[in-house]
């Protein structure tokens, strides 16, 4: 079983649960008489209570505003998983004349056995609320995938808590190059990632799920990006980053045993639940004009 598959176990279970859980109602993405605002998209009744509960940790309005999301933008979301951010981005872009490309897992990637299931669950999600989500175009990102979006077409590309997976799979460099190719000159690469403490030698496989911020910036610069600014929107000073099962010990995954092992029902989550979700870097990088 691949490193990437193991680290994304929570993604698969979340994606496959889309059809099993109670469905949030679909609403028209454009309220009568005015365009849908980002705040209204975040508050939308189509988002589940479980997803909304995570807003306190992920700060979607502040984060997307920091990256410069605008009405009518063309956005590429790499590896959307079960669609936590898609539930915000797709209705907002559909209502404002924008476009969302979802560069999902490469379904035929031999190193990721669950990829086809994850992609199929995501397609079902979009199909079941087609009026809400609009025309989301699903592309792919993986070891041998083609373009994530047409060249020089995107205003904003998003890497949302996935870079550690790509490092483990040896495709992080490709992610940066594919993002660079998709962006318009002057376009923005927005990164949210679990942040390791600075100093020492970076773990190039990100085995515990944390990545040094300086190393992320270095990879981006090597692909041609310019660092515009950083933010502490998603920082969590309570995160000690020394958890027994890596970042996945914390919510929302709450792992209780080593990767690939059955969950331990006797594991005490209290300490880790009190920390909350991980300390995360939030970066805004630019493709030069």
Describe each PLM feature range:
Residues 2-18:
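N-terminal secretory signal peptides and thylakoid transit peptides that target proteins
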Residues 22-24:
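Bacterial signal peptide processing site
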Residues 41-63:
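Class I SAM-dependent methyltransferase Rossmann-like catalytic core
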Residues 73-81:
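Conserved class I S-adenosyl-L-methionine
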Residues 148-157:
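A short acidic, Gly/Pro-enriched loop at the edge of an enzyme's catalytic core
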Residues 173-185:
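A short glycine-rich, Lys/Arg-flanked "PGG" loop and its adjoining helix->strand segment in the class I
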Residues 186-193:
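Conserved beta-strand signature within the Rossmann-like core of class I S-adenosyl-L-methionine
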Residues 269-289:
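C-terminal lobe and adjacent flexible extensions of AdoMet/dcAdoMet transferase-like proteins
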């Amino acid at each position: 079983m691949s490193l990437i598959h193991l680290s994304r176990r929570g993604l698969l279970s979340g994606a496959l649960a889309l059809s099993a859980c109670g469905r949030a109602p679909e609403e028209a993405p454009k309220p009568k008489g005015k365009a849908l605002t980002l705040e209204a998209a975040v508050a939308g009744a189509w988002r589940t209570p479980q997803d909304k509960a995570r807003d306190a940790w992920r700060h979607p309005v502040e984060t997307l505003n920091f990256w410069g999301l605008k009405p009518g933008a063309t956005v590429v979301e790499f590896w959307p998983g079960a669609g936590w951010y898609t539930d915000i981005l797709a209705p907002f872009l559909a209502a404002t004349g924008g476009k969302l490309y979802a560069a999902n897992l490469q379904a035929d990637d031999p190193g990721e056995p669950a990829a086809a299931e994850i992609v199929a669950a995501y397609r079902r999600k979009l199909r079941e609320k087609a009026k809400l989500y609009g025309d989301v175009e699903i592309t792919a990102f993986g070891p041998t995938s083609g373009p994530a979006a047409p060249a020089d077409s995107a205003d904003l590309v998003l890497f949302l808590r996935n870079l550690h997976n790509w490092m483990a799979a040896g495709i992080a460099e490709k992610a940066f190059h594919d993002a660079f190719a998709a962006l318009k000159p002057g376009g923005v690469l927005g990164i949210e990632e679990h942040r390791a403490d600075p100093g020492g030698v970076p773990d190039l496989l990100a085995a515990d799920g944390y990545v040094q911020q300086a190393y992320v910036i270095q990879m981006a610069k090597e692909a041609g990006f310019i660092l515009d600014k950083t933010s502490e929107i998603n920082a969590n000073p309570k995160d000690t980053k020394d958890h027994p099962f890596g970042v996945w010990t914390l919510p929302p995954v709450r792992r209780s045993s080593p990767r690939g092992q059955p969950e331990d029902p006797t594991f005490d989550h209290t300490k880790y639940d009190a920390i909350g979700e991980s300390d995360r870097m939030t970066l805004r990088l630019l493709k030069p004009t």
